[in-house]
Amino acid sequence: MVSDATVQKLADMFTDSVRNTCQGEVAILFSGGIDSTAIATVARQFTAPLLITAGVEGSSDLEAAKRTAAELNLPHKSVVLTEAEIISVYKKCYKIRRGNLLKVELMVPVFKCCREAARSGKWRILSGSGAE
């Protein structure tokens, strides 16, 4: 069993890590899942992060992220991807990360969210991706 002290130390380390990244304006690659929601919840103690989600029109993921962002009372932008955009960005990402098609596929929404963050003047980006 994990002690309360260990849980508190982990929570403190997590908070410190997010605080150290939240110098100035930040964006969070936001799915509305537990990892990105935890980051957003802590980040809002130090800044007003912009939550950004990418997906296709009508996606339940976009809707879930939008609802969770509203519950957190944080600004949220949805990046709606068309089939043509997905193919175009996939080709760009493939040039960056040849060979591992799954990683290239996962890069597409990240690429589009990072572009949106840059357009919004956010140069620090947090992500819960891979937290597990």
Model regions and ranges:
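ATP-dependent adenylate-handling active sites, centered on carboxylate activation for C-N bond formation
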Residues: V2-E132
